[in-house]
Amino acid sequence: MELWDIYDKDRNKTGRTMKRGEPMKDGDYHLVVHICIFSSDGKMLIQQRQPFKDGWSNLWDITVGGSSVAGDTSIDAAAREVREEVGIQLSPAELRKTMTIDFGHGFDDFYTVTKDVDISSLKLQYEEVQQVKWADADEIKSMIDEGIFIPYNKSFIDVLFHFKDHVGTRTAADTSV
């Protein structure tokens, strides 16, 4: 059973938790993280989701994403998700939060990392990840057009690639890394 911390609209923890999969109440929010790992030659490590996954099954996606569990900080969740899904150990110093997107019932923190990784040595989490590969922005946008990548707005892919080399933004209320 996975528990999530519940936040208010200003991203303050409420002191309450909820079980994953339960409906969220109005005014309740949870924390999600996405991590984009880039190679030194500017390609993003992307993953293909398992065909039996709920939501976007069998489609390609950015490197890693997942929900923060109760007690996690954003950066803890980011490091844990990368370790669990693709077997890469990252220190907090390697993770750089580049932006936060508010969505219906949550906050989605995006991190970028530049790290050359030998994909043949990765330990993929069977429950989540089918395979991984390196791809540039044009290849990812072509995959979106082909319907084999999660249908992000293509300009958002450009933003992710832009942020790999530039400092991102954070909310005024969130000054922690």
Positions of PLM-derived features:
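Acidic, metal-coordinating catalytic segment for phosphate/diphosphate chemistry
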Residues: 1-34, 40
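A short, polar/proline- and glycine-enriched secondary-structure boundary/capping micro-motif
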Residues: 25-27, 55-59, 133
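A residue-level structural signature of the nucleotidyltransferase/glycosyltransferase Rossmann-like core
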Residues: 4, 43-44, 132-133
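The catalytic Nudix box helix
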Residues: 45-46, 63-96
